């Protein structure tokens, strides 16, 4: 499941 990873990476959290 790379959906959660992609969403987290796409998020401006970093």
Curated annotation (Swiss-Prot):
Its job: Venom component which lacks hemolytic or antibiotic properties, but produces an inflammatory response via mast cell degranulation and produces a chemotactic effect on leukocytes.
One biological process term in Gene Ontology: chemotaxis
Locations listed in the record: Secreted
Q: Which cysteines are joined by disulfide bonds?
A: none
Tissue-by-tissue expression = Expressed by the venom gland.
Q: Does the keyword Kinase apply?
A: no
Q: Which GO terms describe its cellular component?
A: extracellular region
Q: What is this protein called?
A: Polybine-1
Q: Which UniProt keywords apply?
A: Acetylation, Chemotaxis, Mast cell degranulation, Secreted, Toxin
Q: N-acetylserine is carried by which residues?
A: 1
* Domain of life according to the entry: Eukaryota
Task: Give one GO molecular function term.
Answer: toxin activity
Is Metal-binding set as a keyword in this record?
no
**Coiled coil: which residue ranges?**
none
């Amino acid at each position: 499941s790379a959906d959660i990873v992609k969403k987290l990476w796409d998020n401006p959290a970093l």
